[in-house]
A protein has these predicted regions:
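Glycine-rich phosphate-binding loops of nucleotide-dependent enzymes
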Residues: 1-185
């Protein structure tokens, strides 16, 4: 049998940014996919807030307060910012979408992260810059009372100014008391 991860021990603290750095093929993505509930563990344990937890699927990770911003951002270009932030988690008012509540929470979340470069929350995601798209993806992750946000290569395809903007956003997440993991090479 092939061992992919062995002897891994990582601690992430609230209010701190932890870097997960390694060469291609080192196991960074595999480790994070275990934390996301995409891959199961053959051995070892995941401790969450001091207790051993089983994370059998991504929904279980979200229920614990673990959210992910993947390198491709997982945003739908044909939808606007609000639609992307609530995709799969839409707010309802009876049988109808509660657009007003979703707009309010999206606006509040972006403002809370000090995202000021977006003109309208009803703007199509396809019209956003790389830094703005990254900000929307991060806001989507923190909107659900997350405790830990994992960012996979958050500045990979960004220019200098956009990189500075995203790193400032990451710092604000930690300042709000969230644990943050940044995956990088």
């Amino acid at each position: 049998a092939v061992e992919v991860l062995r002897g891994v021990n990582m601690t992430v603290y609230p209010g701190k940014v932890t870097a997960l750095v390694g060469d291609n093929g080192a196991g960074k993505t595999t480790l994070i996919k275990c934390l996301a509930g995409i891959y199961g563990l053959d051995g070892g344990a995941i401790l969450w807030e001091g207790k051993e937890v089983n994370i059998p699927n991504p929904k279980a990770a979200s229920a614990l307060g673990i959210e992910f911003v993947y390198q491709d951002l997982a945003l739908a270009n044909n939808l606007d910012i609000v639609q992307n932030m609530f995709l799969g988690r839409e707010r309802m008012s009876g049988p109808f979408l509660n657009e007003e509540a979703m707009e309010d929470l999206a606006r509040e979340t972006l403002a809370g992260l000090n995202v000021t470069t977006i003109k309208s929350i009803r703007q199509q995601v396809s019209s956003l810059s790389g830094g703005q798209r990254q900000s929307v993806a991060v806001a989507k992750a923190v909107m659900w009372n997350s405790k830990l946000v994992v960012l996979d290569e958050p500045t990979a395809a960004l220019g200098v100014a956009q990189t500075a903007q995203v790193l400032a956003l990451v710092r604000r997440l930690a300042d709000r008391g969230l644990g943050v993991i940044i995956i990088s090479h």
